């Protein structure tokens, strides 16, 4: 059975290939339309607002794929600390191994940094919350879980952009040492 690819996904796939080939700054709508095998007018019908709307859709899709992969990678999570270590380890390893992200940071640093900070952070936090918050319901109430996920995502991005001399989030022992006091702040204190 052949999988049916929506026209939108076909355009997003083409956009990804074009970005990988030429980088973001030199890319035109015509390049993407040609790669997707559609007209420029069709691309604008699929993504009213053009390039910006299309790249927003691509970023959201890639974030969803990233967090879906993260969710699928979790194994035997017995505690909030274990969850934090596994999530951070997955995220750091994926970001370090992302050739496209590395290329963007090397050649189009301003664009890449904006997508991880000023412009992109609210989107990253929203998608992280959608995917990760439900996974920690057994450890925290919903309001705490939402705050925890936001702080965890901010920490991981910070450690990726400015690696620490003291902690490596890809190393489970190092990540455990970092996250133990962080997680303790969210755990109920035993009274008595």
Name each model feature, range by range.
Residues 57, 69-97, 149:
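Hydrophobic alpha-helical connector segments
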Residues 7-15, 32, 58-66, 70:
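Generic hydrophobic, amphipathic alpha-helix propensity
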Residues 93-97, 152-169, 182-191:
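Amphipathic C-terminal alpha-helical segment
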């Amino acid at each position: 059975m052949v999988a049916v690819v929506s026209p939108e996904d076909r355009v997003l796939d083409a956009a990804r290939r074009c970005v990988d080939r030429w980088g973001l700054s030199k890319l035109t709508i015509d390049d993407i339309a040609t790669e997707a095998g559609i007209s420029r007018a069709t691309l604008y019908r699929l993504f009213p607002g053009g390039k910006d709307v299309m790249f927003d859709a691509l970023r959201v899709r890639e974030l969803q794929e990233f967090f879906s992969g993260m969710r699928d990678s979790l194994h035997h999570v017995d505690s909030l600390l274990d969850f934090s270590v596994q999530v951070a380890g997955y995220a750091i390893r994926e970001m370090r191994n992302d050739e496209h992200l590395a290329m963007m940071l090397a050649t189009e640093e301003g664009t890449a940094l904006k997508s991880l900070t000023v412009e992109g952070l609210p989107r990253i936090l929203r998608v992280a919350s959608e995917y990760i918050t439900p996974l920690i319901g057994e450890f925290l109430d919903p309001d705490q879980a939402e705050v925890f996920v936001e702080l965890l995502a901010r920490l991981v991005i910070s450690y990726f952009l400015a690696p620490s001399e003291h902690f490596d989030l890809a190393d489970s022992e190092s990540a455990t040492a970092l996250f133990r006091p962080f997680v303790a702040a969210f755990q109920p204190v035993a009274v008595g």
